[in-house]
Amino acid sequence: MFLTRSEYDRGVSTFSPEGRLFQVEYSLEAIKLGSTAIGIATKEGVVLGVEKRATSPLLESDSIEKIVEIDRHIGCAMSGLTADARSMIEHARTAAVTHNLYYDEDINVESLTQSVCDLALRFGEGASGEERLMSRPFGVALLIAGHDADDGYQLFHAEPSGTFYRYNAKAIGSGSEGAQAELLNEWHSSLTLKEAELLVLKILKQVMEEKLDENNAQLSCITKQDGFKIYDNEKTAELIKELKEKEAAESPEEADVEMS
């Protein structure tokens, strides 16, 4: 006798007769409510950009942390439940440090992503010999970007289901559908790092409800020379200004209307 739909909903490790895990599907839906995050990989580096939503005018935008460093050569952007992201990021940092201590080398990007996705599967009752870590799947997705000697610049999308894929360009969050369509049109293999920075800002501007500025958007990049770095507000403001000038040069009529 089959269980009811509500009973399958509550069972995080029980498949429905259709072969579905509803709690995992719900966790994927939670990500669609999160702020938009975009990653673009180029031959010069990887760029990450996120929308910083302020739920109150009294909220300090600097306290909204959507892009974080995992190691000197790896960083990530998140969309979904920030509290869940903290657990995944701490696990990733521990994995990176442990690998460095044991092997005296930096962990490669794919191995670290695999470690994070292994953690994402540790929910429910737990397998034999494994500790149950969580009562439900994580409600967050990560864009993990980095550089290593084996595979160069890489961008991975890690889901709450434990699935991960490598992308040249990827968008997650509430504006991901429109952003991904724009990435399909705009991305090409010869993109420079500067072009990728401006493309991320351009797409964020299109999908965000608020006017784009240095307080509600954040950028970071990873290069072989400088490692991972998050741009400060001044650097972000300069890039936004450069984007506006570029758009004005391409379509002066629209720029005149916007200025008026």
From Swiss-Prot:
Protein name, as recorded: Proteasome subunit alpha type-5
CDD domains recorded: proteasome_alpha_type_5
Compartmental location: Cytoplasm; Nucleus
Protein's GO biological process: proteasomal ubiquitin-independent protein catabolic process; proteasome-mediated ubiquitin-dependent protein catabolic process
Taxonomy, superkingdom: Eukaryota
Keywords from the named record: Cytoplasm, Nucleus, Phosphoprotein, Proteasome
Further details from the record: Present with 17100 molecules/cell in log phase SD medium.
Family: Belongs to the peptidase T1A family.
GO cellular component assignments: nucleus; proteasome complex; proteasome core complex, alpha-subunit complex; proteasome storage granule
Modified residues (Phosphoserine): 56, 251
Purpose of the protein: The proteasome degrades poly-ubiquitinated proteins in the cytoplasm and in the nucleus. It is essential for the regulated turnover of proteins and for the removal of misfolded proteins. The proteasome is a multicatalytic proteinase complex that is characterized by its ability to cleave peptides with Arg, Phe, Tyr, Leu, and Glu adjacent to the leaving group at neutral or slightly basic pH. It has an ATP-dependent proteolytic activity.
Subunit structure comment from the entry: The 26S proteasome consists of a 20S proteasome core and two 19S regulatory subunits. The 20S proteasome core is composed of 28 subunits that are arranged in four stacked rings, resulting in a barrel-shaped structure. The two end rings are each formed by seven alpha subunits, and the two central rings are each formed by seven beta subunits. The catalytic chamber with the active sites is on the inside of the barrel.
